[in-house]
């Protein structure tokens, strides 16, 4: 740290100092000269041969030359050989001043009179800070006389001219003495202590150890032995400044004897170009360096100029030795010059430099490497992610460096490895991607930041992304994947994860037949998939979603569970609230326990075809089945035998019910009603609504418990009857109030009563013609026998599912038939007209209508009511006698309301206009009836009012 601090201080003072009257270096020439800043390799290679017995002498020569003194001459001939540098040179920059002062101090130490000239020229303007003895940066051993180097000038040629020195490869004779002399602490200080480290050569030549020690020795041991005089005289200097100064001084033509032979110093760029050219002299850089570390023939043939000619190289040595020379710092300067230059120059043989990073093949020249990279596509981004091809490849790429001969024969190596690289690698790389599963080889060492992107480390991730989801094949680029998709059509079925799992499991068992493969999928995944991919209609499992979809589309199995669950959602609402289970499971537990799949399908078809959720009009078995189902959903789970008994009891108790008053007046009406679907529904609901909770909460003397019941909320009353806890958040009524048809009737009866009443009743009230009045009277007086006969006729007709013509044609025919009946039946008693009309008035139009109407009988009595009531003239009279008769009809009103309610709930096929007309008719007479006033917006009250109007019409 002290050493660095001293160097920084020297540099700071050098910058602040004034300019000496020294010659300014020709910066352009020095900058353009090719011998700039020899590298560490060149220095180390040349120093090995030049460390002879005159080592101390050559260091003194270096010191003398760095100060401008010729080593062969004494102090007396200093100024005669060449003028003093400080006096003759113009002013220098502060860095040059610092260096010159340092050189002058070194000259003073060894008795050269240059210090006086420097002092005379520069004066005491630049005070030199004196370092303490422990940190003296420079150590010039004074063991030898200054004239010692003139005898060994050839051995002291440290020029970096590699080509010139290559011819004379004989080391000096007195290397052993110099090794002993310069070994240890007497080595000069390495000024490049803070710069990047150099890798040692594997087998250094003789004398090479000394040079390495000189450049790599630690500074504290060298400084500790420094003499006080040396430490006081030699300050620390920035090695960069010293190198620049020395190079500028000694290469800028300051010495007339130096004839500016630029080839003495090898420029790194020149070295690079020589390596690239691949010449024999340039390719043997390191080998010739190590084998021929001796003086150049130029120095040997010109002994008179030897004191001057080694100056650039001895200047380099003195820079390393005395701390201000160019070579020790010159290596540093060139290392800073370009990282790649030092990297290539430290590589050794060119074959180790030109190496393919992918196939690890070496090449003698850059041209061979470039050709190899072009042929084998081993360049950068497009490189395969796995450099090592599989072992079954006959000639793997990473074995290419082995076949060529040893690297001494560069031409043979060039041809052999070049040919091997030009043919086999390119052939092998074409098949590289057939082995995508091989583990990746380690990528080359990281040279620059972000090289992973270039060198293909991201290719592996890209291949994981660019993977066909069907066959799992990876691709290098999106284009290849697109081509694969187009060729294989693997994009047609975009598969989910489950589907891909099922496909893989199916492919694994593709050899066995379909059933065996399905049964053999024993993994947990396959079992789960089989459970999921099961047809809900036929309970058949499939391997893939595609098979299940094809099966459902082919067999139409997707419609059945949907419709069945849709019907189940409407009917077993209280049961679902009790259990809070899926509809299908509840159907299987309760309703489907005693029935087969055919029963469900029959029930489905009946639900589809009939508006009353019931089966056909003449089918007694379906009527009983439907009554059983409805009873079972409301009252709870019962055994099939119990359900049958309850259905029979309902059918028998219908004539005993106090609310079916019309059965007392017509004996045959009982038989007709017993066979109808509506009778079962009415009986079921009358019994359920006559439960003790209703009688306990309502007065028994009430004319109609069903109507007054509706003053309380529908949900709470029905839930109480069913015994369901109201604290549970199942506040839906028995009839699903969310049903669209139910909402329709509810809102039209309560909210649209005024407008609908005026719209529907106005045309009927405008012209109460005698014919209409006569019809009203006829309905009041008609007997029950014709009605019963007509009902039987209608129920014996075959069931038709069509609805369209019924609403289009039947109203007009209904008016005609009602008029005919009014004319025929005229003087009958009116005491039981209410109950008769409930049965007869609905059936009258359909029985007496045209043959087309007979082919399309209503699905239930309430259906005929719906079709007739909006258009029937008899309905216009409900406003006249509705107020007086409204209190008498409550028992049958509730039955009519419930039957029409179920009729409306099931009539998905009845058009919106028919429902609107029905609701309008219900609202027309709703305002006059007391039920509407008491019930308000209650849904059941609205439905009851609708049936009350039918009875009022009579």
Swiss-Prot record:
Residues 417-428, 696-712, 842-851, 910-926 have a biased composition (Low complexity). Keywords: Activator, Cytoplasm, Developmental protein, DNA-binding, Metal-binding, Nucleus, Phosphoprotein, Repeat, Repressor, Transcription, Transcription regulation, Wnt signaling pathway, Zinc, Zinc-finger. Residues 20-91, 167-207, 276-331, 383-444, 563-622, 689-714, 748-935 are annotated as: Disordered. GO terms for molecular function: DNA binding; DNA-binding transcription factor activity, RNA polymerase II-specific; DNA-binding transcription repressor activity, RNA polymerase II-specific; zinc ion binding. The keyword Mitochondrion does not apply. One of its GO terms (biological process) is epidermis morphogenesis. It comes from the Eukaryota. Shows a dynamic expression pattern during embryogenesis. Expressed in the embryonic trunk region (PS 3-13) with expression strongest in the thoracic segments. Expressed in a small group of cells corresponding to the anal tuft from stage 14. Strongly expressed in the embryonic ventral nerve cord. Also expressed in the proximal domain of the leg imaginal disk and in the region of the wing disk that will give rise to the proximal wing hinge. Expressed at high levels in the anterior and central embryonic midgut mesoderm and in the embryonic midgut endoderm. It is found in: Nucleus; Cytoplasm. Residues 292-303, 862-885, 893-907 have a biased composition (Polar residues). GO terms for cellular component: cytoplasm; nucleoplasm; nucleus. The modification Phosphoserine is found at residues 750, 758. Its main location: nucleus. A zinc finger (C2H2-type) spans 354-378, 466-490, 533-557. Residues 47-57, 318-328 have a biased composition (Gly residues). Residues 579-588, 778-807 have a biased composition (Basic and acidic residues). Residues 568-578 have a biased composition (Basic residues). InterPro entries: Teashirt_fam (IPR027008), ZN622/Rei1/Reh1_Znf-C2H2 (IPR041661), Znf_C2H2_sf (IPR036236), Znf_C2H2_type (IPR013087). Binds arm. The tsh tio gene pair seems to have arisen from a recent duplication event: tsh has the dominant role compared to tio. Homeotic protein that acts downstream of Arm in the Wg cascade during embryogenesis to determine segment identity throughout the entire trunk. Acts cooperatively with other trunk homeotic proteins to repress head homeotic genes and therefore repress head segmental identity. Necessary, in combination with Scr, for the formation of the prothoracic segment. Promotes eye development in the dorsal region of the eye disk and suppresses eye development in the ventral region in combination with Wg-signaling and several early dorso-ventral eye patterning genes. Belongs to the teashirt C2H2-type zinc-finger protein family. This is Protein teashirt. It comes from Drosophila melanogaster (Fruit fly).
